[in-house]
């Protein structure tokens, strides 16, 4: 399926076929993954090994000590807990993680006797076949009023393209009210908020990096709640849901009208409360007063069963597939989608990368000319760091805010350092590209790891706090190598707040300084991984996390390898264009 058909039955059949195909491929890949030895699963980031059982806490969670979590497993993830001497595995959830300890909440109650042998434990990511939930939503779609009158017309491009007279009037009132708040909002932010408040059916807000998308979302939710609406905030990930709800809760300022629904995980001083079921929450007794609930689309079946919403707000909609979005949209009649199709798209394993974008709800509705606004002022990127993404992803329309444009690195540059280090840390060089001549690196590069660690040490001793910098890399192996190198250069406590992770983990985050280590250089490997390495959306995310300085470490062979595919060559050219915008140096000089 590359685009939606204008025939409703074909739309639904295409989506149903995609759901079934995706579930089958996921099932096969998971079986192949679990057939691998533990050490290979650890390398892939799907397993955390060498767990040592310490205790059962008062909530029944098993608490384990570990040597460091280099996996992609995080709080809220479903896992299987296994032991090297046992075949059986236990289903559970990562309830909490702190430093070198991890809490596992079981599906069934743990018994102390299960942990007679304290060492030898490991956790793997779990697989759940959720296709029945998707198929159930698609089955309901053509037979219900919301499906027939609200959702299918959107997917088929039959919704009204402009505002009607009533919407126009409401838009003008909302816009004028925002304009009276002197200096609070940019023009396109006011347009987005007014559009969301006025529209009767659907509105899209595209939020390029650092443009205040979440701030706009929170204001919209507050105003909807103030006029008595029941609002659902949902997203593809728990992190995105929590982030959006926290921002909305700050705006609303009334804990009794805000609730998060889902299985309990550890919360850290949140400004909202969590409940397992709607009936347990204060929302159930709010009557006609507006409120906001936040949950995954899957929670609507049991935790929020029978609850009708006025407005469905989908955050990070660029990452949500259309079937998952439909599951949420069936619970309400108005849809506000916040996202950016130029950043990371949906996670899909059954289709080639270039087909995945069309499977996302944000991309699909943009193609159907749904009413939309693109926020065009970034508060994150300075003037130099804004130029490249603006020209290559946002039609030259993205510009830095007045306060962000002149922002530069302010830490002291050590005068005794090598010339290449001075160039790298120079405040007047916000974008730096460090050339390397290694030629045999795949998923890790010792040269780049050593240089990245040296730069971090220099920044740290120049006064930059660890939490103000991060390292982004395509491969977990490189992240591990950089951490190990840092362990030899700095006391462990001094860089605890430093994030070293993959692009996927950094979407939505920002730091003053970002190091991007691309590491790959072996020609055959670069060709094999070209779709992944040169993915424009991943590159856009990686290049737009920094507020004041982006430092890219890459082998010259990454850019000179001939790919013999016109599409991939275009994407390789995009990376070359980023290098052309940079101050270029080399640590081999």
Task: Please provide the spans of the model-predicted regions.
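Hydrophobic anchor at the beta1->P-loop junction of P-loop NTPases
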Residues: 205, 233
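Conserved helicase motor core of SF1/SF2 NTP-dependent helicases
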Residues: 226-229, 235-239, 298-589
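Conserved helix-turn-beta segment of the N-terminal RecA-like "Helicase ATP-binding" lobe
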Residues: 239-270, 484-493
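Inter-Walker segment of RecA-like/P-loop motor cores
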Residues: 251-301
């Amino acid at each position: 399926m590359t685009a939606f058909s204008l025939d409703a039955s074909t739309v639904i059949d295409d989506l149903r076929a995609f759901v079934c195909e995706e579930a089958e491929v996921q099932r096969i890949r998971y079986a192949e993954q679990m057939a691998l030895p533990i050490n290979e699963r650890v390398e892939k980031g799907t397993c955390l090994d060498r767990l040592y059982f310490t205790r059962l806490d008062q909530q029944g969670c098993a608490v384990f000590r570990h040597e460091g979590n280099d996996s992609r497993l995080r709080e809220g993830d479903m896992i299987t807990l296994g032991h090297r001497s046992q075949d059986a595995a236990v289903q559970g959830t990562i309830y909490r993680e702190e430093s070198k300890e991890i809490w596992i909440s079981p599906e069934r109650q743990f018994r102390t006797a299960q942990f007679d042998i304290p060492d030898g434990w490991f956790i793997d990511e779990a697989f759940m076949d959720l296709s029945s939930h998707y198929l159930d939503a698609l089955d309901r779609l053509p037979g219900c009023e919301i499906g027939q009158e609200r959702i299918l017309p959107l997917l088929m491009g039959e919704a009204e393209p402009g505002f009607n007279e009533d919407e126009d009037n409401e838009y003008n009132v909302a816009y004028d009210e925002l304009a009276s708040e002197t200096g609070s909002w940019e023009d396109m932010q006011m347009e987005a908020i007014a559009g969301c408040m006025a529209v009767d059916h659907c509105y899209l807000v595209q939020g390029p990096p650092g443009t205040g998308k979440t701030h706009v979302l929170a204001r919209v939710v507050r105003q909807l709640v103030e006029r008595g609406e029941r609002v659902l905030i949902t997203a593809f990930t728990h992190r995105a849901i929590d982030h959006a709800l926290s921002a909305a809760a700050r705006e609303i300022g009334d804990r009794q009208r805000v609730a998060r629904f889902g299985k309990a995980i550890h919360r850290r001083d949140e400004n909202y409360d969590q409940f397992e079921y709607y009936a347990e929450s204060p929302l159930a007794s709010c009557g006609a007063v507006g409120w906001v609930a936040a949950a995954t689309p899957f929670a609507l079946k049991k935790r929020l069963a029978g609850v009708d919403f006025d407005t469905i707000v989908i955050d990070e909609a660029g990452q949500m597939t259309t079937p998952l979005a439909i599951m949420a949209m069936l619970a309400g009649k108005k849809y506000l989608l916040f996202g950016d199709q130029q950043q990371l798209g949906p996670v899909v394993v059954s289709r080639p990368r270039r087909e995945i974008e069309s499977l996302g709800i944000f991309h699909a509705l943009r193609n159907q000319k749904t009413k939309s606004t693109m926020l065009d002022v970034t508060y994150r990127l300075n003037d130099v760091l804004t130029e490249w993404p603006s020209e290559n992803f946002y039609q030259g329309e993205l510009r830095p805010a007045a306060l962000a444009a002149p922002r530069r690195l302010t830490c002291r540059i050590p005068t005794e350092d090598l010339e290449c280090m001075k160039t790298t840390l120079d405040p007047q060089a916000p974008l730096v590209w460090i050339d390397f001549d290694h030629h045999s690196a795949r998923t890790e590069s010792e040269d780049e790891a050593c240089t990245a660690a040296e730069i971090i040490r220099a920044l740290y001793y120049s006064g930059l706090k660890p939490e103000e910098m991060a390292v982004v890399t395509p491969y977990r192996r490189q992240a591990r190598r950089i951490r190990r190198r840092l362990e030899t250069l700095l006391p462990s406590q001094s860089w605890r707040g430093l994030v070293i992770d993959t692009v996927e983990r950094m979407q939505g985050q920002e730091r003053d300084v970002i190091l991007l280590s691309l590491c790959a250089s072996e020609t055959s490997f670069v060709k094999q991984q070209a779709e992944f390495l040169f993915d424009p959306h991943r590159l856009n995310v990686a290049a737009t996390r920094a507020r004041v300085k982006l430092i890219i470490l890459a082998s010259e062979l990454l850019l000179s390898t001939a790919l013999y595919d016109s599409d991939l060559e275009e994407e390789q050219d995009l990376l070359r264009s980023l290098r052309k915008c940079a101050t270029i140096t080399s640590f081999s000089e």
